């Protein structure tokens, strides 16, 4: 079973759309222990500096990137389960994305889809996929084949 308390999301920018915020809150209630840190929009350099101050050296860093590795929901659940409860930090860029140097620091880069999404929707999708991964590893009814 996934231990969500080992996961953190660093997201650049505020959620402005109410319906997205409501969706995020719904999943966060189902994922107690998942930490979400929101960083103010700024230049990529300032955002990178802030992110580097937040993360620690023992964290497994995953950046969301359209060129990252794609997984099915079951593959993602398996990859997370095989991380053996490492502290995993997911980083979602703002409107300008993440700097290449920050992406290069990542242990791996994750693509949620070959499509490009606004950062607000990417945050909702990631949190939903973490909930789905937890349900898959628990054998719960949420994930349908």
UniProtKB/Swiss-Prot annotation:
EC number(s) stated in the UniProt entry for this protein: 2.1.1.177
Disulfide bonds: none
The UniProt record lists the keyword Oxidoreductase: no
GO cellular component, one term: cytoplasm
Reactions listed under catalytic activity: pseudouridine(1915) in 23S rRNA + S-adenosyl-L-methionine = N(3)-methylpseudouridine(1915) in 23S rRNA + S-adenosyl-L-homocysteine + H(+)
Cell compartment(s), UniProt: Cytoplasm
Keyword entries, A-Z: Cytoplasm, Methyltransferase, rRNA processing, S-adenosyl-L-methionine, Transferase
GO MF annotation terms: rRNA (pseudouridine-N3-)-methyltransferase activity
Gene3D superfamilies: 3.40.1280.10
One Pfam family matching this protein: SPOUT_MTase
Top EC class of this enzyme: transferase
Family of the protein in this entry: Belongs to the RNA methyltransferase RlmH family.
Role noted for this protein: Specifically methylates the pseudouridine at position 1915 (m3Psi1915) in 23S rRNA.
Binding partners and assembly: Homodimer.
HAMAP family noted in UniProt: 23SrRNA_methyltr_H
Protein's UniProt name: Ribosomal RNA large subunit methyltransferase H
Lineage per the UniProt record: Bacteria, Bacillati, Cyanobacteriota, Cyanophyceae, Synechococcales
Gene behind this protein: rlmH
């Amino acid at each position: 079973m996934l231990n969500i308390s080992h996961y953190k999301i660093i997201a650049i920018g505020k959620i402005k759309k109410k319906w997205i915020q409501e969706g995020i809150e719904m999943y966060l209630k189902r994922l107690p222990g998942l930490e979400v840190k929101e960083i103010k929009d700024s230049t990529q350099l300032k955002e990178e500096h802030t992110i580097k101050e937040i993360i620690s050296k023992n964290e497994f860093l995953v950046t969301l990137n359209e060129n990252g590795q794609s997984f099915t929901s079951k593959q993602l659940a398996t990859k997370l389960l095989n991380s053996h409860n490492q502290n995993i930090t997911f980083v979602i860029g703002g409107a300008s994305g993440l700097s290449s140097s920050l992406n290069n620091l990542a242990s791996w880069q994750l693509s949620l889809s070959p499509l490009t999404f606004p950062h607000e929707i990417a945050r909702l999708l990631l949190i939903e996929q973490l909930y789905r991964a937890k349900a898959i590893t628990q054998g719960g009814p949420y994930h349908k084949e």
